[in-house]
């Protein structure tokens, strides 16, 4: 009996594995610290805006997310006509791959880049080429060394998940200058809101002055709208025009659009979340280092800690130990980091519990 056969390369794609969801434990509070979600939830104004959409669920959305694009444009001083909104930035990444990659093409990503990059690349029949990182950080020279006549696109998460590292804007500018003009540079800024470094920029300047660079952002992280799937891209007119030709006409829902507009206007909520993250990022790094763990310097809303390979002290054993205590972190085997755990910065209570639990774990004989 014959059956449908997927396109070449589809079955070579490793399915994306999200962070573990917590399993209820009788008599114990469970904290999900595995998916880099905000511990504060969305702005109350975003919740109210979302609820207001219930009165007209029979109506299709405005097909271009115009009101949201205008709100984003006003917030960041951008031309709304050069903004595309999507069902999460994941959809936009896939749209970019579908627009610019075909069988025989190559896209470049770094060793520990976001796992959606290989999916988007290979789903379009293209080959993903890996540029080695240096100290868990993007290496511009390594990327440029991988460029070939078949290179059509470069994926760069800056800052990066799951490492939490970033490269200064001067390095991003050097990367763009070193790439052929026909290569699209995709700057994924999902975690940009958490960066507090003077030498960091999202890349909007490059987008404004080139025809081959885009910046992607999400409302899933600091704005707390992960459940609604809403993100956006700022790009040159030529790329926006091309992507819009394959974008679904009603790809973002009315509730998501309204909530995102309210979220982006509530700057106090954003600043509160950012301040909490920065304070705890420093504290957790210090505490985990005291325990003998190696912590990769992070500019995001999570920390990456590396465990010994000694029996009784491994990342897998620490993960099990924490899970038993209602603390759900992210193991990173699928990223090629089997000896590390990634912890989302949670509430004060959750963070203190992780510190105490790891102190107990590392003190075991």
From Swiss-Prot:
GO biological processes: L-histidine biosynthetic process
Gene3D superfamilies: Aspartate Aminotransferase, domain 1, Type I PLP-dependent aspartate aminotransferase-like (Major domain)
One function term, GO molecular function aspect: pyridoxal phosphate binding
Keyword Amino-acid biosynthesis: yes
Keywords: Amino-acid biosynthesis, Aminotransferase, Histidine biosynthesis, Pyridoxal phosphate, Transferase
PTM sites of type N6-(pyridoxal phosphate)lysine: 221
CDD domains: AAT_like
Pathway note: Amino-acid biosynthesis; L-histidine biosynthesis; L-histidine from 5-phospho-alpha-D-ribose 1-diphosphate: step 7/9
Pfam family, one: Aminotran_1_2
InterPro entries, alphabetized: Aminotransferase_I/II_large (IPR004839), HisP_aminotrans (IPR005861), HistidinolP_aminotransfase (IPR050106), PyrdxlP-dep_Trfase (IPR015424), PyrdxlP-dep_Trfase_major (IPR015421), PyrdxlP-dep_Trfase_small (IPR015422)
Cofactor: pyridoxal 5'-phosphate
Quaternary structure and interacting proteins, as annotated: Homodimer.
UniProt-listed HAMAP family: HisC_aminotrans_2
Xref: PANTHER family: HISTIDINOL-PHOSPHATE AMINOTRANSFERASE (PTHR43643:SF3), HISTIDINOL-PHOSPHATE AMINOTRANSFERASE 2 (PTHR43643)
Record-given protein name: Histidinol-phosphate aminotransferase
Provenance organism: Rhodopseudomonas palustris (strain BisA53)
Lineage: Bacteria, Pseudomonadati, Pseudomonadota, Alphaproteobacteria, Hyphomicrobiales
Gene responsible for this protein: hisC
